[in-house]
Amino acid sequence: MYAVIKTGGKQYRVREGQILRVESLGANEGDKVEFDQVMMVGEGADVKLGAPLVEGAKVAATVTANGRGKKVTIIKFRRRKNRSRTKQGHRQNYTEVEITGISA
């Protein structure tokens, strides 16, 4: 069984037992979280599509880790201007979850 969930402004296709990195949820390690914005649920040829969400569908998960991703570097150059260069960078926070159940 698989599902398409929406969290952190992104959509993910998940199935039970899968480990997934999503935008930071603010939950501690070992906490149980529930995603209720389920856009699609499928098992074999049986597919339920939401418009935009599937009613009553939920995906349960357990938080396995919190961390920070690799550094993303941004460099801006402005042509024909003396010393007009900018270098910035940031590390995005993430939450790693393990999908424990899908119910529709």
UniProtKB/Swiss-Prot annotation:
GO cellular component: cytoplasm; ribonucleoprotein complex; ribosome
Source species, domain of life: Bacteria
Matches recorded under Pfam families: Ribosomal_L21p
Keyword terms: Ribonucleoprotein, Ribosomal protein, RNA-binding, rRNA-binding
Entries under InterPro entries matching the protein: bL21-like, bL21-like_sf, Ribosomal_bL21
Entry GO MF terms: rRNA binding; structural constituent of ribosome
GO biological process terms on file: translation
Reported function: This protein binds to 23S rRNA in the presence of protein L20.
Subunit structure: Part of the 50S ribosomal subunit. Contacts protein L20.
Family: Belongs to the bacterial ribosomal protein bL21 family.
PANTHER family linked: 50S RIBOSOMAL PROTEIN L21, LARGE RIBOSOMAL SUBUNIT PROTEIN BL21M
Protein name according to UniProt: Large ribosomal subunit protein bL21
Organism: Hydrogenovibrio crunogenus (strain DSM 25203 / XCL-2) (Thiomicrospira crunogena)
